[in-house]
Swiss-Prot record:
Family recorded in the similarity comment: Belongs to the UPF0758 family.
Protein name, per record: UPF0758 protein PFLU_5982
NCBIfam families, per the entry: PRK00024.1, radc
GO biological process: proteolysis
Domain MPN: 102-224
SUPFAM superfamilies named in the record: JAB1/MPN domain (SSF102712), RuvA domain 2-like (SSF47781)
């Protein structure tokens, strides 16, 4: 049965307009993005099938173009649309942060860093640079690879902090495995960067680790 033949209250688009996007299931949200189904499958049925094939919404959103295009009902146009939606979401969160103090909106910071880093297949180390009022000046990914071998040079972090004229910063990196447990190397690097940045009077407010679930704050655990 086509979605058009469903009762209005059960159609994903109508439900979204009436109750908001948060009221929809993953399959219903994906169905709105897909717009149409394929022969023998409505958009919702196709969405359910795709979620089962990929193992959930996150793996689908993080899929490579090659893997994405292998699925019936998907293709280069849909992949491009999806990447545009994801990038707009990142930029929206970045814009929100630029207008607020980090200390007043820690959840927004974590949401932003999660959006920036969670989908990356490799470990990325970056910094969120802040002014004296803890407003965001910018974000930069400074290295790629495991923390042990990522070549995170303190002088590089100091150089970028001075370039932004930052008064403080938040360190961050992701664990592609999904684990949120900081390694011994993570803690060692944090202490090393703290000492290097103290010399130029730049405070390290936190080191956020992005994995499965809510990002972990090393500051909240007393590891800073």
């Amino acid at each position: 049965m086509s979605i058009r033949d469903w009762p209005a209250a059960e159609r994903p688009r109508e439900k979204l307009l009436e109750w908001g996007a948060a009221s929809l299931s993953d399959a219903e949200l994906l169905a709105i993005f897909l717009r149409t189904g394929v022969s023998g499958r409505s958009a919702v049925d196709l969405a359910r099938h795709l979620l089962a094939q990929f193992g959930g919404l996150r793996p689908l959103l993080e899929a490579s173009q090659a893997l994405f295009n292998q699925q019936l009902g998907l293709g280069p146009a849909k992949f491009a649309q999806l990447q545009a939606v994801l990038e707009m979401a990142k930029r929206h969160m970045a814009e929100r942060l630029r207008h607020d103090s980090v200390l007043e909106s820690p959840k927004a910071v974590r949401d932003y860093l999660k959006a920036m880093l969670r989908h990356e297949p490799h470990e990325i180390f970056g910094c969120l640079f802040l002014d004296s009022r803890h407003r965001v000046l910018g974000f930069e990914a400074l290295s790629q690879g495991t923390i042990d071998a990522a070549m995170v040079y303190p002088r590089q972090v100091v150089k970028r902090a001075l370039a932004y004229n930052a008064a403080a910063l938040i360190l961050c990196h992701n664990h592609p495995s999904g684990s949120l447990e900081p390694s011994a190397a993570d803690r060692k690097l944090t202490k090393l960067l703290q000492k290097a940045l103290e010399v130029v009077d730049v405070r390290v407010l936190d080191h956020i680790i992005v994995g499965d679930g809510d990002p972990l704050s090393m500051a909240e655990y007393g590891w800073l």
